[in-house]
A protein has these predicted regions:
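Acidic-basic catalytic patches of nuclease active cores, encompassing PD-(D/E)XK
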Residues: 1-30
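Acidic active-site catalytic centers that drive phospho-/nucleotidyl reactions
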Residues: 13, 38-40, 53, 73, ...
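Conserved catalytic cores of phosphodiester-cleaving nucleases, focusing on short active-site segments
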Residues: 20, 39-65, 69, 77
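Hydrophobic "anchor" residues on beta-strands that sit immediately upstream
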Residues: 26, 49, 94
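Short acidic/glycine-enriched loop/turn segments that link adjacent beta-strands
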Residues: 35-37, 107
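Mid-chain, well-packed structural core segment of small domains
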Residues: 62-95
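Domain-level recognition of nuclease-like catalytic cores that cleave nucleotide substrates
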Residues: 87-123
Length: 123
């Protein structure tokens, strides 16, 4: 992975976490890792546990960042979320999946929150 891609991802995650905190979310964990992969942000909004995937782009050439969260990515995030809920003994806790799309453009950055971006995908 190139340094530019890593810095784009890190910058996007920083902006996303700040945006979520300002929107009333409480950040519980960042970059939660398990054997199935990583979730960018785990947060709480009220009683709901929110698993957040952050997608960042430095250009609009490849389309909107949130379009990168396709079915296979949703399955992977779902598997990681299930592992998290089991590990933390939170299986009965209401949970959902949000996506934060961050555009890091020369004219400035834009952050878009998509609540309930997808359902639990186990296929």
């Amino acid at each position: 992975m190139s340094l530019m891609r890593i810095s784009t991802g890190k910058r996007g995650e920083e902006l996303a976490a700040a945006y979520l905190a300002e929107a009333g979310y409480r950040i519980v964990e960042r970059n939660y890792r398990c054997i199935f992969g990583e979730i960018d942000i785990v947060a709480e909004e009220g009683e709901t546990l929110v698993f957040v995937e952050v997608k960042s782009r430095r250009s609009e050439a490849y389309g909107d960042p949130q379009l990168a969260v396709g079915y296979e990515k949703q399955k992977k995030i779902s598997r990681i979320a299930m592992h998290y809920l089991e590990e933390k003994r939170l299986r009965r806790r209401p949970a959902r999946f949000d996506v934060v799309a961050v555009k890091l453009l020369p004219a400035g950055h834009r952050v878009e929150l998509i609540r309930n971006a997808f359902e639990l995908t186990c296929g």
